[in-house]
Amino acid sequence: MLPLSLLLSFGLLQPSGTVINFDSSTLGRVPPGWSVSMTSRGLPPRWEVRRDLSAPTQPYVLAHLSNDAGADRSPLAIFDRLSLRDADVSVRIKAVAGREDEIGGVVWRYRDPGNYYLALANALRHNVAIFRVQDGRRVQLRVPVPHDIEPNAWNILKVAVRGSRFQVYVNHRRVLEVYDHAFAQPGKVGLWTMDDSLTYFDDFRVYPK
């Protein structure tokens, strides 16, 4: 039997948290335990497990691949096996391509495709932003913060959720903090992208607090 330290380093066991690296999922499919949805209208989202040799955890990632420039749609991949109020939620994001946006984000306290919180990192506009999506409309919780998000490279996006306080980190550096009381109840967590962004995700981590 492998010692506990090795199990932790391989991502096979994590103390009091959930770590998903997609490496045991089936290529070309949505991973088990995840569902696909979308805010607004446009071409259907296309999420699937894909091979990427640059992945932080080799060899697979979860990718959003459909392209619908100008539709202002927000494809979502929701992890259905958790519902929580407070947590640290993080993911590694690789913004591969996009003419209008190169963007990826995490969502929390997700109720349905029209109601959730969202933090995003934009490699085209080089900023980080946080929103409340309510009744299908994005409500900006503060002005986006300029921050260098390297395109076609892996960046860590994390949100620390404690009651009404939300802190957003990029590559372990805190970038912004806001307070909002609209959605106080527990909800699901997941991944988000927008419009024509081709975005890869890996090493999704959720630690309840």
Language model: regions and residue ranges:
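Ligand-recognition surfaces built from glycine- and aromatic
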Residues: S16-N21, F183-K209
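Short tryptophan-centered beta-strand motifs in secreted/extracellular beta-sheet-rich domains
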Residues: F22, V89-V91, N152-V168
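Secretory/extracellular carbohydrate-interaction modules
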Residues: L27, P59, H64-Q134
